[in-house]
């Protein structure tokens, strides 16, 4: 009997373009394969053991004869390709009415709302990665004290202010108010408060990031687990991506290794329910991304050795982020899924699954909660024999 599920979602863990990726300009996206090619191969022995080499050909990764985990890949049926859409679908909510708000930048009407609430003129309003926005607008920001604003070209806008110019609490509150005002105006968008530190030309993200998001438009696995009396713990930005709904408690740590440490620590404190962690392992430079991914792989045995008989571990992603492509933005890709447990089957090919909502259905079935409206559980495939 499964008593506890550990769900690790790696931000940007793509493994090849989805059939509709061309509509998003992502038909060439293949995050992990291109990363491996760029750095001369990846050393991921623990993901390799779980079955990574069976999901896709990756330089440096072998296809094991007897994988220790079950493996497959997940597609996404929702429109969009950002973290909100990805995590909502992983939780059992497919969004088909999503309108891309910031395809050409943040619209003027939205900018008027944002600048009214911030109380200052902003600079930027470009489609960019964080590193690019901070590099290009950092010197002007330090000189003018104007907040930097940018978008992912989808449905997220980021607001960055140096810690010496606005307190983290003030920045978070203003972004919370922006999200509410835009929601009241009928705009569904994620607003990210990102404090920064450093000197002109070398600004970098600091602690205190918060993501302000509307609640999911449907029933999630968190809702039904909460309703059934299960404990639901959020680590990283998981809590923010659901506007807190359905979580018992959250720990807003954004360093991937700190988040992983939090999960390890909870194994001794949380006896049942769901531990849901987000891990950002794809910084915007190829060598740093490969280093982060390999460091995560080396830490997996620390998790596995602490598992109990009734534990189930699921490792997957929320979208791709092919750093070899221009822009270094989220990409429309399949994500791998790996499942392991001390007492369940090994080496089962879970196949190519149409929707990431299958993860949610598996989690609620494993923890004996009510069935969700969408998704097919793969729990039966995990049973030994």
Model-derived features with residue positions:
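Feature captures the catalytic ectodomains and active-site-proximal regions of enzymes
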Residues: 1-385
């Amino acid at each position: 009997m499964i008593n506890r599920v550990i769900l690790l979602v790696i931000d940007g863990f793509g493994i090849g373009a989805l059939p509709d990726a061309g509509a998003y300009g992502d038909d060439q996206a293949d995050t992990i394969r291109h990363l491996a090619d760029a750095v001369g191969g990846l050393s991921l022995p623990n993901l390799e053991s779980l079955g990574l080499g069976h999901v896709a050909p990756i330089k440096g990764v072998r296809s094991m004869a007897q994988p220790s985990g079950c493996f497959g890949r997940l597609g996404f049926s929702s429109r969009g390709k950002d973290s909100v859409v990805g995590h909502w679908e992983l939780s059992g909510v497919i969004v088909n009415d999503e309108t891309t708000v910031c395809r050409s930048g943040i619209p003027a009407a939205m900018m008027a709302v944002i600048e009214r609430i911030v109380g200052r003129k902003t600079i930027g309003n470009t489609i960019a990665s964080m590193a690019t926005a901070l590099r290009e607008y950092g010197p002007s920001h330090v000189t003018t004290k104007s907040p930097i604003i940018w978008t992912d070209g989808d449905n997220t806008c980021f607001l960055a202010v140096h810690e010496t110019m606005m307190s983290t609490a003030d920045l978070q509150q203003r972004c919370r108010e922006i999200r509410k005002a835009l929601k009241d105006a009928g705009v569904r968008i994620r607003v990210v408060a990102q404090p920064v530190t450093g000197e002109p030309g070398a600004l970098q993200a600091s602690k205190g990031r918060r993501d302000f998001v509307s609640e999911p438009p449907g029933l999630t696995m968190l809702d039904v687990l909460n309703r059934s009396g299960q404990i639901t713990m959020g680590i990283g930005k998981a809590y923010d991506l659901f506007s807190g709904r359905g979580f018992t408690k959250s720990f807003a740590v954004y360093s991937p290794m700190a988040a992983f440490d939090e999960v390890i620590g909870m194994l001794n404190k949380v006896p049942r329910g769901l531990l849901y962690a987000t891990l950002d392992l794809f910084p915007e430079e190829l060598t740093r991304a490969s280093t982060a991914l390999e460091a995560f792989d080396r830490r997996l045995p620390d998790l596995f050795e602490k598992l109990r008989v009734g534990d189930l571990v699921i490792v997957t992603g929320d979208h791709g982020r092919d750093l070899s492509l221009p822009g270094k933005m989220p990409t429309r890709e399949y994500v791998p899924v790996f499942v392991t447990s001390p007492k369940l089957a090994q080496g089962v090919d879970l196949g190519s699954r149409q929707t990431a909502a299958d993860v949610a259905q598996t989690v609620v079935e494993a923890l004996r909660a009510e069935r969700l409206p969408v998704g097919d559980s793969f729990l039966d495939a995990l049973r030994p024999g």
